[in-house]
Structure formats: C-alpha cells, structure tokens
Amino acid sequence: ADADAGSVDKLKQGAVRAMLRHLRGELSLHASAVAIGKRSALFVGASGSGKSTFAAYLGERGWPVLADDVAHLDQSEDAFLVQPSEGAHFLMHDACVALGIAPDEERVKTRVAVKTVGEASKLAAMFSFVDDDAVRVTRVAGYEMIQILSPCVARFVFDEPAALRTDLGRLGTLLAKVPLYRIGRPRGFEHLAEVEQRMLEVVQ
C-alpha cells in the first residue's frame, strides 16, 4: 500500500503538476535535480541514461533531492528556481544494488528513501548525460542547447503554435541565464564519484 501511495504521490507531484503548469505557460522538464548548498544542479538525458540513479546517489551522499524525473522551474528576477517535487524516488534493481539498497523483488522498480528539501533552490547549472569513454564535462553553446533541452520539456499541448512559441521562449530565457554542460561518462556505476566531483567543480 505504501508503494502504491508513493506512486500516486509521484504522479501528482510530477506529471499532473507539470500538465497544469504547462497549461499556464510555465516550464517543467523531464529531469532530475539536486540541491547543492544554496544552489542546485539539474540533469537531463535519454530514458535509462542514469538521471534518477545519479540523483539517488547524490541523495545518499547528503545532497537533498529536488526532483526525480520531472523538475518544475520558475523564473525569479534574473534566475530560475527549481521547485521541490520529490515525493517518491524509484530505482531499477541494478541501481539499488550498486547503491547498497535492498531491491524490492516483487516490483520492477524499488521505492527508496532519499534526503529531500522543502524550499526552492536557485538553478546554477544543467547537465546532459551522454555516453563517453571517460568522464568529461564540456560547455554546450548555440543551437545545440535547444536541441538538447527541447525534447525534455514536459508538453501536453502539441498542436497549438502559441503553446510552442511559449515553450521556446521559456527555454530561450532559461538558456540565457543558466549554463548547460554535456557530461560524458562510461556506462556503469563505478564512475558515479568522479561524475559527482566534476559536477561539483562547476556548481560550487
């Protein structure tokens, strides 16, 4: 019952909240996010790229998790804030084992406890996970930024040009204020600590 309640809460705080925000012209991204002191970092990537696993790893390291798979962003003067939306965090079995968490053998994904925070955090940097033969962090510039982030927008209206213009306008404002980096790493959990170190060098 607890897992079912957690799934419902995750849906409410994630997809349902994102839908209502999108209808109001607000921005949510398919992403995970973690608070780093008084700032925050956001992570995007294809399904299975490790966004949730990395957020859970950072949570285990003591950094509060703001979002698991949907991050809600609000503009505040010259910055963007990540609103907390983490109600339940779910991981695949192999990720649980790698993080030393006992997996729920009766379910495809296991609900895990992570450190959370109740207030919004200023977004310092965004990172896009890609496969590479070593851990590398490079700044993304130009139209490639839109190419990376546009598919990550939580959209629920697809056939209205005005809605698309609003989405692109929000993305443009976001990218003008918050840097986007590509973070390459080999597949596997043994590189999580190095990825954390390189990320912290950018954010802190």
Question: Can you describe what each PLM-predicted range is?
Answer:
Residues 1-23, 199:
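Charged, amphipathic alpha-helical linker segments immediately N-terminal to NTP-binding catalytic cores
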Residues 51:
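Conserved lysine of the Walker
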Residues 20-36:
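Pre-Walker A adenine-sensing motif
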Residues 48:
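Walker A (P-loop) phosphate-binding loop of P-loop NTPases
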Residues 54-55:
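Post-Walker A alpha-helix
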Residues 32, 36-45, 60-204:
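Glycine-rich, often acidic-flanked micro-motifs
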Residues 2-3, 26-27, 139-143:
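Short hydrophobic/aromatic-rich motifs at helix boundaries and adjacent loops
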